Structures are given as structure tokens and as C-alpha cells.
């Protein structure tokens, strides 16, 4: 990402808004800022926010590109606003949305992990605990991750890109609270296929980065997930059976694709 591009983004926001890039994906670029879109900046404030920006795609017709950017930015913003209201579900708070220019302003979550282990997403957290992978802290955190996914799915929402990098951990004393982030591919869906795919994507992400301990890690995640459904009584047990059955089918299809190359 060039300084010229950053300056161009800054010109959309006005020079008063400081930005620092932290990640770049296929659809969006994520910046941090210390500037709130509406509130005056407090002196000596260390408060940070996230700005997610969908840049124009030159390969698309400008009118089509503008329409897609507006639709996707609004869709993600509306989804986050609804998810934030679900009791027990942890997602970043939506602060502002500019769909015409492709900007979303969000609450900043997480921190740097001790010992130079990077930002506090689930992937880095598990790497940090690689010397003690089966500790109570790791098990508890992964079950909490499963509960977050369970709450998301029980309320008929799907993430669409559920990797260990899209789960941010927020410190709560000696413990950590998982938050689901980046709902650019999120959707409202009661389809067991979509839920099964979500679970499979996370399972594969854990397997690819923490292969030695992946079986136990994924089992703990599923314990938390299943707990949410079982708390809903007979209806929850029935739906859980449907989701886990489809998850197994999705997993089987994935294995067949791997074997065939």
C-alpha cells in the first residue's frame, strides 16, 4: 500500500482524521484512527477506532462499482447493528457508516499480546500458548469462542469468513472474551448448509495453523457451540442435530475435494 494511496483515502476523510493502515484484504482496507467521526478529540486521549474502507475497483464499470460498494457497506453496517443487540453476542459497535464512499467506522477491540506475540486474535493467542496448549485458560477461551458462534447461528446469522484471525480476544481480568469481527461476507440465514460451512471454515483454519493440537481445539469449540443449542431445550437439540449432521456432510465434501486435488 503506497503513501499516495493513504493520502488519497485521507483526502476523503479530511486531513484532520489521522489514519494508520493495519490490514488489507481483497475487498477492504482497515485503518486505525484516534478521531471519532462526531465527537471532539479529548486531550491526551488514547482511544482508538477502526475505519474500514472499500476502495473503488478499476476493473468494474464506475456505476456498477459504486452501487456494489454502497450495497455491501450498508449490508455489513446493518448486520453489525442487529448483531450488537443480541444478548451475549460480542461484536464491535458500529459508530458511523458512509455507504457512498465505502467507509465504516467501528469500535476498536483487542490489544497487543505480551511477549511480542502480535495482536490479540485467536490465531496469535493459540500460538502464544503453544507450550501449554491444554491449559484451563485455552480450553475456557475456545469454549467461549464456540458459544459466540452458537449464539450467532442460533439467531440465524452466518459469518461467511469465520477464521481464527476474525476472532478478536478482549482481556477481562485474567480471562479473555472472544469477539467476532469482519462481517463483510456475513448474512441472515437459517440454512444449515451456511452454518455447516461456517463451522468447517473455522475447523480448517485451526487445522492449518495449529495442526498439532487442532483436534482438541476444535472439540472445545464445538462443546461451547453445542451448549448454546442445548440450552434451548428440545427445539435446540433438534436444530443442533440438523446443523452437526450438515457440518459432517460439508466436512466429507471437503475431504473428497482434497483427495481429488
Swiss-Prot record:
Keyword terms, alphabetized: Activator, ATP-binding, Chromosome, Cytoplasm, Hydrolase, Kinase, Nucleotide-binding, Nucleus, Phosphoprotein, Serine/threonine-protein kinase, Telomere, Transcription, Transcription regulation, Transferase, tRNA processing
Catalytic activity, as annotated: L-seryl-[protein] + ATP = O-phospho-L-seryl-[protein] + ADP + H(+); L-threonyl-[protein] + ATP = O-phospho-L-threonyl-[protein] + ADP + H(+)
Sequence positions that bind ATP: 22-30, 43
GO biological process, one term: tRNA threonylcarbamoyladenosine modification
Gene Ontology cellular component terms for the protein in this record: chromosome, telomeric region; cytoplasm; cytosol; EKC/KEOPS complex; nucleoplasm; nucleus
Coiled coil ranges: none
Protein kinase domain sequence ranges: 16-261
Source species, domain of life: Eukaryota
Residues that bear Phosphoserine: 187, 189
Major localization class: cytoplasm
Active site: 161
Enzyme Commission identifier(s): 3.6.-.-, 2.7.11.1
GO terms of molecular function: ATP binding; ATP hydrolysis activity; protein serine kinase activity; protein serine/threonine kinase activity
Compartment(s) of residence: Cytoplasm; Nucleus; Chromosome, Telomere
Domain notes: This protein is considered an atypical serine/threonine kinase, because it lacks the conventional structural elements necessary for the substrate recognition as well as a lysine residue that in all other serine/threonine kinases participates in the catalytic event. BUD32 has protein kinase activity in vitro, but in the context of the EKC/KEOPS complex, the catalytic subunit KAE1 switches the activity of BUD32 from kinase into ATPase.
Family of the protein in this entry: Belongs to the protein kinase superfamily. BUD32 family.
Subunit description: Component of the EKC/KEOPS complex composed of at least BUD32, CGI121, GON7, KAE1 and PCC1; the whole complex dimerizes.
Role summary: Component of the EKC/KEOPS complex that is required for the formation of a threonylcarbamoyl group on adenosine at position 37 (t(6)A37) in tRNAs that read codons beginning with adenine. The complex is probably involved in the transfer of the threonylcarbamoyl moiety of threonylcarbamoyl-AMP (TC-AMP) to the N6 group of A37. BUD32 has ATPase activity in the context of the EKC/KEOPS complex and likely plays a supporting role to the catalytic subunit KAE1. The EKC/KEOPS complex also promotes both telomere uncapping and telomere elongation.
Miscellaneous section: Present with 3020 molecules/cell in log phase SD medium.
Entry-linked PANTHER family: EKC_KEOPS COMPLEX SUBUNIT TP53RK (PTHR12209:SF0), NON-SPECIFIC SERINE/THREONINE PROTEIN KINASE (PTHR12209)
UniProt protein name: EKC/KEOPS complex subunit BUD32
The species this protein was found in: Saccharomyces cerevisiae (strain ATCC 204508 / S288c) (Baker's yeast)
